Amino acid sequence: WLLAAATLAACSKEVSGYDPPALADRTVLLYMPGQSLIAYYENNIQGIRTAVTDRALGKGRMLVCWQPDDQTSAVMQEIYYDRNKRCSEAKTLKTYDDFDAGDPAAVQQLFADAAELAPARNYGLIIGCHGKAWIPASGGVLPRSMLPADDVWTMAPGAKPTRSFGDTGYELDIT
């Protein structure tokens, strides 16, 4: 009787449809801060879920961090292929209840969390949000017609192509 009970208990255990690699070849983080482009973010996530098949990621991992509810919280999710369900799934890895996309320390912590939660040999970062070209976040919002012509069309020597990104009030400079 005891052997039969042990056998039944072993058979009832569900086998996971996804086993993340201990060390992925590559982890890609899609970081989409802010709320003003939320419909586009949702469309992007759905597109990724459609693209993730049983072979799409190989030994890699796909993370998405976005702010679906408001400007002060964020969620980091992994999109993966579940071989039992035969479709892509999204799993929340971490939630941020007090997140400021304009705070370099908060964004740095988010990147560190991604590396800890999905360790990899290589990392990729995709940022999807508003950007201000080479204007720093402190430059405010200026219509192009108000800027001097050479400030609009000529980058400062040694400047990176993008200097800041994010929603108004939540911009972050790239240094």
Give the ranges of each region predicted by the language model.
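Sec-dependent signal peptide recognition
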Residues: 1-4
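C-terminal motif of bacterial Sec signal peptides marking the signal peptidase cleavage site
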Residues: 7-10
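N-terminal extension/subdomain marker
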Residues: 12-120
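Chitinase-like catalytic core of GlcNAc-active glycosidases
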Residues: 105-175
